[in-house]
Amino acid sequence: MAIRLFQSQTSMFCEKARIVFALKKVPYEIVDVRKDDRKSLIEYTGQRKVPSMDYNGQCVIDSTVISALVNKDYPAISIYPEGAANKGLCLALEDWSDEVLIHANHALRRADTPEARKKAEEEWAVHFATLNQMYAGKKFIFDRLTLADIAIFSQLHYLYTAVKYEIPTKYGNVTAFMENMRQTLKLKSLGDSFEAQSL
């Protein structure tokens, strides 16, 4: 059996899953859903959401569920921090990133008037300020790379790869985190999508 990841290269959630696979060095095959207008995805899963995964014959949908399953079956290099309280905080930050930062991304990408752009940038300013405090004096949220950092990076990285927007330099802790992640993931630039199969 094999693992197939149904994905779109520009999706931040698909990037999150790809980073988890690479961190754990789990081999998998990519099925680009854009190549057949999601027909293979719909045929296998009965829905349109990515990432979805054929996990040795088991249909798994959603980046959070995919990450948890891969971590359970490949426990080396855990994507969660040590301790129940830290794991709970990690999951809360992942959820905040997935549910809140995505809306800020979409608002900025879809801003088609100067007013909409200004409002979207003001929303991001609040998030950047929060993240700047979170990463003060830290390379990662916890003592090493975890799913919280991966989820946050994937949302922020989307600004560079899809929105073509750079994080303002006044948020120095955030830009330092992004540079740290760029080096960790071996990206030539933040404008490059993450594609490596292992780290």
Regions picked out by a protein language model, each given a short descriptive name:
Residues 97-179:
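GST-like fold's C-terminal all-alpha helical module
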Residues 166-199:
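Long hydrophobic alpha-helical segments typical of transmembrane helices together
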Residues 50, 76, 137-138, 153, ...:
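Alpha-helix C-caps/helix-loop-beta hinges
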